[in-house]
Amino acid sequence: MKKITVLALGLAAAACTQPQELPDNVMVTGTNPIITNQFTADPTARVFNGKIYMFPSHDIPSVITHVDGSAWFSMADYHVFSSEDLTTWTDHGVIVRQEDVPWGKPDAYSMWAPDCVEKDGKYYFYFPNTSKNGGFAVGVAIADNPEGPYEILPEPIEGIHGIDPCVLQASDGNAYIFWGNGRCAKLKENMTELADDNPRETVKWGPFEMEMVGVSCLQGLPSRQAEGPFAFEYNGNFYLTYPYVREDTEVLAYAMSKNPMGPYEYKGLIMAEHENDCWTNHHSIVNYKGQWYLFYHHNAFSPDFDKNRSAQIERLYFNPDGTIQEVKPTMRGVGPVKSSHKVHIDRYSHIEGAAIEYLDTTDYFKGWKTVFEKAGDKVRFNELDFGRKAPRKIVLRVRSSVPAELTITAGKTGNVSFPECPEWTEIELPMPFKTKGMQDLEIALVSGNNIEIDWVSFK
């Protein structure tokens, strides 16, 4: 970026500032997507030791093809991430690799959605992979810490043939594992084997028959191409949530029961199809510090290939009867954002007229910019924390071929102006008013056209 000193029109001198650097494995977001340097699909969120831990699958650019010859989902390992505030995320690195799975095919790239639970001080990480014997299986890796290191057991769980494991630790003292298209079975106390008293049934696929352990919890429910079951318990009810293809792409649906193994009664949608026709969605639901959250994925960093997905978060609410209110995806997300950080207003709460575009179409991880095309265009970014001390300056990373004036609103309202800066420039200007505490930030264009803003900050 070009470093220059510019003069703010009608105001004091404006100066360039240096962006604050973070360790490579730490990122500050608070907005969606929450991880901005790699793909993080199928996010399973769990609370351990007062922190949120997220165990996603790890999409990479496709290295395998589907049976129809098209590029396909490719996942070779698992990372684990943690956060204490849903804004600052730490990547603890790879915990399981496909080539380290004793029973798995080392080049299958089929490490789909995982899960992790804790029992008696041990952390049990459940993951699918393609078996060397063919077909999918679910393995277990065990650690003394959610961040690892994990020891992979030499054999998968006998009796499970599928992907997307989810383990429910129920109030009846038992643990239940769900997988595939909603199948469920009870686990032994050791958390690594299916219990001996699970029911068995013969399942038919066309001319083929197979004896399966457990029960099909989606029996009789809307479940076309269902996958990714996630089960949890709340206020005496068991919830089985799952993605399925209602028309052409996936929705997130749910059913309720008084018994962890069902039968379940269908209740409706948690989230409708993605507006951009991203084919899949996959999720988890967790209570953290008294608030329920929905973790899910979208292809925000891969608009041209919907098999590279990124984790996002929204707040989730229950009705008095225990049913779930439908969740709308947002760009603002849920994390608290400090005004002293780089505030990416392209992750807006509301927009009028302005456009959101990628900063670099050769590297989508660089994020987005907000383009104020004409006077009157505006964006609002909700819940920005200005702290206890009113900032004296506003910093903008902007690009503009003409001088511009903006109206800034955050509890109070004032205007700032800057000259043309045809290259990306960080401009520091006097804050036009004093404000403190939690405010909704609105930025509107007063004069100028095609003004591009990467981020704003206050100090």
Residue spans for each PLM region:
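Generic cytosolic/nucleocytoplasmic N-terminal low-complexity/intrinsically disordered segments
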Residues: 1-2, 173
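Hydrophobic h-region of N-terminal signal peptides that target proteins for export
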Residues: 9-17
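Sec-dependent signal peptide recognition
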Residues: 2-8
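Carbohydrate-active catalytic/glycan-binding domains of CAZyme proteins
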Residues: 16-459
